[in-house]
From Swiss-Prot:
LRR repeats lie at residues 97-121, 122-145, 147-169, 170-193, 195-217, 241-264, 265-288, 289-313, 314-337, 339-361, 363-382, 383-406, 422-445. Its EC number is 2.7.11.1. The modification Phosphoserine is found at residues 821, 850. This is Probable LRR receptor-like serine/threonine-protein kinase At1g56140.
Amino acid sequence: MLRLWRYLCLLLTVWFLCNFGPVYVVRAQNRTGATTHPDEALALNSIFAAWRIRAPREWNISGELCSGAAIDASVLDSNPAYNPLIKCDCSFENSTICRITNIKVYAMEVVGSIPQQLWTLEYLTNLNLGQNVLTGSLPPALGNLTRMRWMTFGINALSGPIPKEIGLLTDLRLLSISSNNFSGSIPDEIGRCTKLQQIYIDSSGLSGGLPVSFANLVELEQAWIADMELTGQIPDFIGDWTKLTTLRILGTGLSGPIPASFSNLTSLTELRLGDISNGNSSLEFIKDMKSLSILVLRNNNLTGTIPSNIGEYSSLRQLDLSFNKLHGTIPASLFNLRQLTHLFLGNNTLNGSLPTQKGQSLSNVDVSYNDLSGSLPSWVSLPNLNLNLVANNFTLEGLDNRVLSGLNCLQKNFPCNRGKGIYSDFSINCGGPEIRSVTEAVFEREDEDLGPASFVVSAGQRWAASSVGLFAGSSNNIYISTSQSQFVNTLDSELFQSARLSASSLRYYGLGLENGGYTVTLQFAEIQILGSTSNTWRGLGRRRFDIYVQGRLVEKDFDVRRTAGDSTVRAVQREYKANVSQNHLEIHLFWAGKGTCCIPIQGAYGPLISAVGATPDFTPTVGNRPPSKGKSMTGTIVGVIVGVGLLSIISGVVIFIIRKRRKRYTDDEEILSMDVKPYTFTYSELKSATQDFDPSNKLGEGGFGPVYKGKLNDGREVAVKLLSVGSRQGKGQFVAEIVAISAVQHRNLVKLYGCCYEGEHRLLVYEYLPNGSLDQALFGEKTLHLDWSTRYEICLGVARGLVYLHEEARLRIVHRDVKASNILLDSKLVPKVSDFGLAKLYDDKKTHISTRVAGTIGYLAPEYAMRGHLTEKTDVYAFGVVALELVSGRPNSDENLEDEKRYLLEWAWNLHEKGREVELIDHQLTEFNMEEGKRMIGIALLCTQTSHALRPPMSRVVAMLSGDVEVSDVTSKPGYLTDWRFDDTTASSISGFPLRNTQASESFTSFVAPRSEISPRNNDARPMLGAQMNEGR
């Protein structure tokens, strides 16, 4: 009996420690009786009450502010799981009193002024109030915080002058006042803060000159001085900041020349110096900066030549010397720098030819608008290369038309149709598909994947576009922005739901225009930065750029949102007069360093435009159509008569053959009858590209058949999907996939290069995406690291692709098999939805389609799995599952986990009910955005609701992910599959609803079930596609 009692006592002790251990330990940390100083406790409670935020239980245990995480040295300020957060020092008055030393209220959408009580917390050493909507001014009482070391007010709406009392904070190491609305000059007193290591005053609103007292800031390691209205020359004393590793001076109004003292800054790894007026400088000052990895010296009136020793800068990854006055030849050693990936030399007067060799890492090259000549080296045809060679004098004879297509029209003086105008207008939907406006004007599509150094020429050589620039600090450069907003002052909202972005310079050209006067119409809508009335820090951004028409500056520091009355739902139209005298028209949008850099994301700046057009101010005399290949009307008539006769004879023969083989080639006929026919490859071409389908080139095996990597004669790497011989289902999918994907073109949909239907051979040829599929990245060997921001962008990209399929494409399409293995990643980790073999064209006038069930277990919506009830909400459900997989880094089902975690959707719901959603986030992520994580989980649960009517359309999903609208509350349990058990060969009994699968995502089991209702007692549905490992890579 005594032994039993001891056993029960032991169990009770273990239970007590498991449940109350953490609290007990925290209280043990305060055994001395140390408590928060009552004045500070009152002040902090007043501050939080004014800001309508609460002190969380992690550091406010039983009402004691300085407890838990607040006194736990292992909890760092940078930990996103703790926000808001305070830290305390409890060593005062014989360890009986705690003083508040740190306050973090970061990106919490706090609105209002800073309460006066904050300035009474004199023991503060670290204050982080960044990314809120704080208003009002900073008072002189700021000088009370003399112990302050790190002070951040960046990205708020603070105004008024900076008080001179800031000079009393002599222990300050970091000062961030960037992206605010301050006024007045930069206080001289900041120069007293001689221990400063980091200073960020970009976009702060301050003006005047850089104070002479800044010469004392010799401990500086990082300095951002950009987007300001400063006066005077760049001061010499910056050359004394010899500990600098990062320096940004962009769009400040400071004039040159660049001081020779800059040559002392040999510790720099990143130098961004741009938009300096007056004064000519050479590149002599960089001669000893051999540690640089990023060197941007854009638009600075630089003269002279590129240093011959540039090949010694072995750490250089990005070099931008564009928009200067450099001359001479390009050193061959520059193109062979091993680390260099981005090179911008455009808009200089460089001559000679391109180097004959190029380093493997160099994938983005801009040499546009120079005096380069000669033949192009062989490397220009390499795949995965962004190359802008516009406006030079290259010899292009013998160049394959598929390589740098249209470049002949964009050489110096724009020679195509020069002297014989054939067009009298053009209209372009920038960044979007072809659109017909309410006035019946056709805006041609311009949704090419223009990268950091790119150009495109339209099929009829009517217009062209050229873009250069790399967004600073952005891990995933995006050059098209999309939105589902409806705009209140136009009947053509669709025209403004996409926009072309550029990080530096964006040009549109009208080619072959009849000479005369034109009205140029530019249309804009700010769809990336929210309105400033949105009560979120994401609405505090400012975009500004310059506009030139025919070389004439027509807008300086143009701000789309401000012009629209600070509205993001109003479109803006601008009209300018231009004269065309040499058959071409140029519209140039140029970023001159102005605007905020990082709101709502890193790299949200530079030109943005929705549509471009030009119409004549005269009566045209040209046909406004591409030139006819015929030489004379007589020849045309004779040709037609002869052609009709021959066609009649041939038609009879063809009809006879077709009728004879109709049953055999029904899929060929479907392809031939398509409006937009895919490019047709010969079987021998694809055999050669894949080295006769060599097993070493095999990427995977799917239900459709094997997939091979290949290389075409033009150098393009492709993925070739080969239809399994004799597969009737495969032939149906072959046609379905061609019909579906040929009807759509989008940045987030895999690109079909063409197909082969020669004899019994059926092959599809896709762009090759080197980073494989999302499931491999998430659940594979983890050779590809996806950080949080990348996962979020992948989620947003997939959502945008589905919006296009459901709502924007000419043919509405339900994919039916959205899953992690059907989302491929390109070299920049941009997601592409692939594998349209199960896609259904969808009539949006119908409420749903009844069809046989096809898809992958684990991603199937309940109404579709149970009743074959198909709508676009079927894809929404599958997207929700993929979103959860992205958040958690695990498949939707895993038999190796404990029961409560085995099924991802069920586990997510249980955590949501307990308010512990954050536990779902992948523990392998060292950093993540808490707000985005909760948002993504909430959206995923909305997308997987049992009733399809409760699931949001994908356009609303994009708006919620983008932060344009709030995430709706999840009010009911999602429709996860609870009792429907499947295996690789049969879908067995259904004993209830909702449903849950038992197969892990990594098995990628797809199945096809009969169209009719599936019987719960006698279900003979069988997986007919089999395992789709690495499908479509």
